[in-house]
C-alpha cells in the first residue's frame, strides 16, 4: 500500500541515483563550463594522479526535476550547502543518491530541499550537498513584466555588507561567463540557463547563469587556497542573493575571519562571496577547510 501519491513532493521522497565513472571527458566539460583549470585536474597531484574537481557532480540533484513543484515560473536556486569528505580521483566510480529532506514556506515562496549523497566504490561517503530551490506560491494569473529583472540588484535593500569584517583576503580571478560556458555547464538542452527565449518564458529578461556555477567558483577559490584541506574537509553554506546573467563578469572573493582548532588541525572560517565587475554580490555565505 502506497502512503503518498506518486506526484507528491514530500520529505523523505527518494529521488533515485546512479553509478557514474569520473572520466577525463567529464573533467574537461567541467573546465569548459567554469573556467577552473587547476593543474591537479589533468596532471600530477599530491595523491599521485589527476584529482577531480570537488564539485565535479555539481548538478546531480538536477538530473531529474520530479522534485520541483508544479509552478516552475520564476523558480530560483537560493541556497547551497556542501560538505566534502574525501578527494575523488579521475577514473573512480561513484554512486549517488538524492532525497527530499525539507520543505518550507517563506513569504511568497515555497522551498524544497534536495540532498545528494555521493559514495565511492568502497562505500565511503565523499560528499553531501543540500540544494534549496524556491518556487512562487501560486496566486492567480502571472503579473506583467519579469519575475526578476536587472534593476532588482541595484535596490538598496539588496546590498550585502560582506568583506567588512577584516581578515586575510583570498583573491581569485574575475571571468566573463559566456554563453558557450553556460551551454557547457548547463546544456546541451535548451533551458533558461542556456537560451534567452527559454529564460523569458520563465519570467527572466536574459539567460540566468545556473547558480551552481557560482558555487563552483567559490569551491575553486577554496581549493586553490587550501588544496587537500578543502578536498578532505571542505564546507560551504552559501546563499544566492542576486541573479548572474549570461555574459556578466564575476569572480569569488574571501576573507579568513577566524581559525578554530579541530583535533590536531586548524579550520579557517572564510567569509565567502561572488561579485560582478560592478561590485554587485551574487552569492554570500561562509566556507571552511582544514589546514593540512
Task: Please place each PLM-identified region on the residue numbering.
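A conserved acidic, glycine/proline-rich C-terminal tail/linker
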Residues: 233-237
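HotDog/MaoC-like acyl-thioester-processing domains
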Residues: 1-10, 79, 84-169, 240, ...
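Short, glycine/charge-rich beta-strand/loop segments that flank catalytic centers
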Residues: 45-48, 116, 238
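Hot-dog-fold acyl-thioester-processing enzymes
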Residues: 1-79, 140-232
Amino acid at each position: 500500500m502506497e502512503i503518498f501519491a506518486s506526484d507528491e513532493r514530500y520529505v523523505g521522497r527518494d529521488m533515485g541515483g546512479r553509478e557514474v565513472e569520473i572520466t577525463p571527458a567529464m573533467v574537461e566539460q567541467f573546465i569548459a563550463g567554469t573556467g577552473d583549470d587547476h593543474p591537479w585536474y589533468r596532471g600530477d597531484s599530491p595523491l599521485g594522479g589527476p584529482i577531480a574537481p570537488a564539485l565535479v557532480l555539481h548538478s546531480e540533484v538536477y538530473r531529474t526535476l520530479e522534485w520541483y513543484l508544479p509552478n516552475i515560473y520564476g523558480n530560483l536556486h537560493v541556497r547551497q550547502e556542501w560538505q566534502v569528505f574525501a578527494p575523488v580521483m579521475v577514473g573512480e566510480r561513484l554512486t549517488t543518491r538524492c532525497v527530499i529532506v525539507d520543505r518550507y514556506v517563506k513569504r511568497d515562496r515555497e522551498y524544497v530541499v534536495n540532498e545528494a549523497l555521493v559514495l565511492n566504490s568502497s562505500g565511503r561517503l565523499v560528499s553531501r550537498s543540500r540544494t534549496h530551490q524556491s518556487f512562487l506560491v501560486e496566486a492567480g494569473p502571472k503579473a506583467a513584466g519579469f519575475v526578476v529583472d536587472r534593476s532588482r540588484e541595484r535596490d538598496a535593500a539588496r546590498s550585502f555588507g560582506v568583506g567588512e569584517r577584516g581578515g586575510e583576503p583570498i583573491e581569485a580571478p574575475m571571468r566573463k561567463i559566456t554563453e558557450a560556458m553556460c551551454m557547457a555547464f548547463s546544456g546541451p538542452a535548451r533551458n533558461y540557463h542556456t537560451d534567452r527565449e527559454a529564460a523569458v518564458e520563465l519570467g527572466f529578461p536574459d539567460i540566468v547563469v545556473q547558480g551552481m556555477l557560482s558555487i563552483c567558483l567559490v569551491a575553486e577559490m577554496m581549493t586553490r587556497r587550501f588544496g587537500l584541506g578543502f578536498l578532505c574537509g571542505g564546507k560551504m553554506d552559501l546563499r544566492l542573493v542576486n541573479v548572474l546573467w549570461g555574459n556578466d563578469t564575476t569572480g569569488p572573493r574571501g576573507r579568513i575571519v577566524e581559525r578554530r582548532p579541530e583535533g590536531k588541525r586548524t579550520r579557517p572560517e572564510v567569509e565567502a562571496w561572488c561579485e560582478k565587475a560592478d561590485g554587485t554580490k551574487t552569492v554570500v555565505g561562509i566556507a571552511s577547510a582544514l589546514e593540512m
